[in-house]
Amino acid sequence: MARNEIRPIVKLRSTAGTGYTYVTRKNRRNDPDRMVLRKYDPVVRKHVDFREER
């Protein structure tokens, strides 16, 4: 398997509706579902959920 198949680059978009995104990698074997992380959104100046975008 190629490196990019196991750990693809994914975009995490803010659920606050600001359009702010984080870019990260994820392991498909450990996390086959869409990722949801609670991170800081500087537009609203709060911690909000960021969901994986495909």
Swiss-Prot record:
Record flagged with keyword Ribosomal protein: yes
Q: Which Gene3D superfamilies match?
A: Ribosomal protein L33 (2.20.28.120)
InterPro entries recorded for this chain? Ribosomal_bL33, Ribosomal_bL33_CS, Ribosomal_bL33_sf, Ribosomal_zn-bd
Query: Which key words are in the record?
Result: Ribonucleoprotein, Ribosomal protein
One of the record's GO molecular function terms: structural constituent of ribosome
Domain of life according to the entry = Bacteria
Which terms in the GO cellular component ontology are assigned? cytosolic large ribosomal subunit
Q: Name one GO biological process term.
A: translation
Tell me which HAMAP family the record gives.
Ribosomal_bL33 (MF_00294)
UniProt similarity note: Belongs to the bacterial ribosomal protein bL33 family.
Q: Indicate what this protein is called per its UniProt record.
A: Large ribosomal subunit protein bL33A
